[in-house]
């Protein structure tokens, strides 16, 4: 089973809302909607793994909290600076959720 992290993105939320509407109007079954979401999880993880080539570095002023549970790291950072080739972005708070990409779940 793939990670479901991307269901809370704009794309994932829109997909879920559309599926809920189709279920409400009787156009698809809840089982089919569930299968669509599982396929979305697999596809988005594969696409990000294979197609995204951009690199970004970041530096945090402070690591506020960290947690490791079920092969998932959660980091809460303060005063973070992200750098791409020609662009720098500074933010007050960032939450990073990092999953094991080698676990065979993709």
UniProtKB/Swiss-Prot annotation:
InterPro entries: TFIIA_a-hlx, TFIIA_b-brl, TFIIA_gsu, TFIIA_gsu_C, TFIIA_gsu_N
A molecular-function term among this protein's GO annotations: TBP-class protein binding
Disruption phenotype: Females are sterile.
Alphabetized CDD domains for the sequence: TFIIA_gamma_C, TFIIA_gamma_N
Gene Ontology biological process terms from the UniProt entry: RNA polymerase II preinitiation complex assembly; transcription by RNA polymerase II; transcription initiation at RNA polymerase II promoter
Subunit structure: TFIIA is a heterodimer of the large unprocessed subunit 1 and a small subunit gamma. It was originally believed to be a heterotrimer of an alpha (p30), a beta (p20) and a gamma (p14) subunit. Forms a complex with Moonshiner/CG12721 and Trf2.
SUPFAM superfamilies: Transcription factor IIA (TFIIA), alpha-helical domain, Transcription factor IIA (TFIIA), beta-barrel domain
Distribution of this protein across tissues and organs: Ubiquitous.
Compartment(s) of residence: Nucleus
Family, per entry: Belongs to the TFIIA subunit 2 family.
Protein's UniProt name: Transcription initiation factor IIA subunit 2
GO cellular component terms, A-Z: heterochromatin; nucleus; transcription factor TFIIA complex
Signal peptide: none
Gene source species: Drosophila melanogaster (Fruit fly)
Coiled-coil ranges from the UniProt annotation: none
Gene: TfIIA-S
Pfam families with a match to the protein in the record: TFIIA_gamma_C, TFIIA_gamma_N
The UniProt record lists the keyword Transcription regulation: yes
Chain's role: TFIIA is a component of the transcription machinery of RNA polymerase II and plays an important role in transcriptional activation. TFIIA in a complex with TBP mediates transcriptional activity. Part of a rhi-dependent transcription machinery that enables the generation of piRNA precursors from heterochromatin while maintaining the suppression of transposon-encoded promoters and enhancers.
Alphabetically ordered keywords of this record: Nucleus, Transcription, Transcription regulation
